[in-house]
Amino acid sequence: MEYRKRVDALVFFSLLLLGYFAAHAHGKGHVTDDVGVSTPAKEGIMQGNGARCVVGFPPCKDNKCYCCIGGRTHARYSTMAECRHACF
């Protein structure tokens, strides 16, 4: 019985550490400097072919139905033109 408790504790702490490092690695995708502004290198990467504006799911909040995915911002916009201007 004592051996079983040790194995359970080892598995628990292993999963806990794995979760911590997974969350930490996921956070590395968002690079900011000391004042919270994205670095130019990261913005340049994000502006690549993956950036696009899409129509969000209804209901739209404050008549802002367009959102930028993979670009410089994650905000919502009223028109596709506004979204493209801010996103790219």
From Swiss-Prot:
Keywords: Developmental protein, Disulfide bond, Signal. The keyword Disulfide bond applies. Residues 1-27 form the signal peptide. Expressed exclusively in endosperm. Disulfide bonds join 65-87. It comes from the Eukaryota. Belongs to the MEG family. This is Protein MATERNALLY EXPRESSED GENE 2. It comes from Zea mays (Maize).
